[in-house]
Amino acid sequence: MRVLGVDPGLTRCGFGVVDGGNGRTVTPVAVDVVRTPADLELSSRLLRISEAAESWIDLHRPEVVAIERVFAQHNVRTAMGTAQAGGVVALAAARRGIPVCFHTPSEVKAAVTGSGSADKAQVTAMVTRILKLAAAPRPADAADALALAICHCWRAPMIERMARAEAAAAEQKRRYQARLAEVKKAGTR
């Protein structure tokens, strides 16, 4: 499975592609960070990120895009910009019919380090080790993008099993409710 991991941000947006194999085998394909100047209008910055996402998707042809979920930050403005950057990447993937999955920072940290509270240095060190890289990806946004892709490769089978279980439970509930309605209807005759 080829996964494009994206660490969204207005100033620096990390992109990382890995190929996931059997078990926990992952192979690095590409990594980079797209930068946008703070003095540009927001719309221009988002356009640059969107164009970069489209280019990465067209070049690397991922089966899925994994984006960091923004849920809380102390600086509301930063959180909004990060969410907007993630949104334009999700839109670029959706336009190409590519599924998008969101992972929280703690999910990503736990997947690659074993601890949901790991710091950036620990995440970078483990990404370097897992992917057998000669040097650590820099800046941290690049390592985070690769970590997101790794996380998704490792969590995808579980996510798929959960989706199948939820679908089966919903079908079972539908059948039960239909049978219950039949019994009630028969009892009122």
UniProtKB/Swiss-Prot annotation:
Cofactor(s) the protein needs: Mg(2+)
Protein name: Crossover junction endodeoxyribonuclease RuvC
Binding-site positions, Mg(2+) 2: 68
Gene it is expressed from: ruvC
List of residues binding Mg(2+) 1: 7, 141
Highest taxon listed in the record's lineage: Bacteria
Family statement: Belongs to the RuvC family.
Organism: Rhodococcus opacus (strain B4)
Gene Ontology MF annotations: crossover junction DNA endonuclease activity; DNA binding; magnesium ion binding
Disulfide pairings: none
